[in-house]
Design a protein with these regions (language model features):
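Bacterial N-terminal signal peptides that target proteins for export
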Residues: 1-10
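Bacterial N-terminal signal peptides
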Residues: 10-18
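Beta-strand-rich domain onsets/edges
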Residues: 24-45, 51-53
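Periplasmic peptidoglycan-binding/tethering modules of Gram-negative envelope proteins
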Residues: 36-39, 50, 59-62, 69-71, ...
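Conserved beta-strand core positions
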Residues: 46, 135, 165-167, 205, ...
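Short beta-strand segments within Ig-like beta-sandwich modules, predominantly Fibronectin type-III
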Residues: 74-78
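Periplasmic OmpA-like peptidoglycan-binding domain that tethers envelope proteins to the cell wall
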Residues: 170-239
Length: 239
C-alpha cells in the first residue's frame, strides 16, 4: 500500500526523532576483513584526503561520516593529513558536498591494508551520474527509512550550493520482485517529495524508474550486494 506524502514524511520524522533520543542507532556491520587470514580488531589508522579528480589537486572539504559515532553522523573537516582511528568491524558512510563538484557518496570498511585514502570529486558536467547508497527504504516498502536523512540532506545541500543544477532522481530495484519498474519509480518519487517539501523547486527535479535493468550485481551473493541493486542514483540533467 502506498501512503500519502505527508504520512511518509511523518514516518521519516518520527524515525529521526527516535534516533536523536537514543532509542535507535546506526547499523554496525561486520567487515569482510575480519574473515581473512590476518584477523584483527585493532584500530585501523587511515589518512583521508579529498582531491579534484581532473587535476589531482587536494581540496580542503567537509565530509559527513556515519560510523565514527554510532549514534549520529559526524561532520569532519578534511585536509591533506587528516588521520582517523577506524574500527575494522564497522561500515562507514561518507558524503561530500562542494560547489561545482558532483555529490560524493560511498560506503567503506576500514581495510587494514589501506593506510591512505583519497576521495576524488568529479567536476560537474551534464550527464554525470552517481549512486547514493545511504538512501534506504523500509524493507518491502517505498517509504524512506530514517537513516536516509544524512544522505537526503546532502542531496538537498548539493542542489542548493549549485543553483543552476537540475537532477534526475533514479530508482533501481532487485530482480525477482514484483512490479520492479513501478517500485523503483515510486522510491525515486519519495526522494523527490522529500526534496520538494524541503524547499527545492520541483522544476529542477525529475523522476525515473529503471527497475532491475542496471543491477550492479546480476547474481548477488550477500545482503550488501542485493541492497546495492536496490538503490537510488542521481544524474545531472542541467548545469
Amino acid at each position: 500500500m502506498t501512503f500519502p506524502p505527508c504520512i511518509r514524511l511523518l514516518g521519516l520524522l518520527l524515525g529521526l526523532l527516535s534516533c536523536v533520543h537514543g532509542t535507535a542507532q546506526f547499523v554496525v556491520e561486520r567487515s569482510p576483513w575480519l574473515d581473512g587470514e590476518a584477523v584483527t580488531e585493532e584500530p585501523v589508522h587511515q589518512t583521508w584526503a579529498v582531491a579534484d579528480q581532473s587535476t589531482a589537486q587536494l581540496i580542503q572539504a567537509e565530509l559527513t561520516v556515519e560510523g565514527l559515532n554510532p549514534r549520529k553522523p559526524v561532520r569532519l573537516s578534511v585536509d591533506d593529513d587528516t588521520t582517523l582511528k577506524l574500527a575494522p568491524y564497522r561500515r562507514y558512510s561518507r558524503l561530500c558536498v562542494e560547489p561545482d563538484f558532483m555529490l560524493y557518496a560511498d560506503y567503506i570498511y576500514a581495510d587494514p591494508e589501506i593506510q591512505a585514502d583519497t576521495l576524488l570529486l568529479e567536476p560537474l558536467a551534464i550527464g554525470l551520474e552517481t549512486a547514493l547508497p545511504a538512501i534506504e527504504f523500509m524493507p518491502g516498502t517505498e517509504d524512506l527509512y530514517f537513516t536516509s536523512v544524512p544522505a537526503l540532506e546532502a542531496l538537498h545541500a548539493f542542489i542548493e550550493v549549485n543553483p543552476t543544477v537540475s537532477v534526475a532522481i533514479i530508482g533501481h530495484e532487485e530482480e525477482g520482485t514484483t512490479e520492479q519498474h513501478r517500485t523503483s519509480r515510486n522510491r525515486a518519487r519519495a526522494v523527490f517529495e522529500y526534496l520538494v517539501s524541503s524547499g527545492v523547486n520541483a522544476n529542477r527535479l525529475s523522476v525515473e524508474g529503471r527497475g532491475s535493468a542496471q543491477r550492479l550485481y546480476p547474481q548477488p551473493t550477500t545482503p550488501e550486494e542485493a541492497e546495492a541493486n536496490r538503490r537510488i542514483s542521481i544524474r545531472v540533467t542541467n548545469y
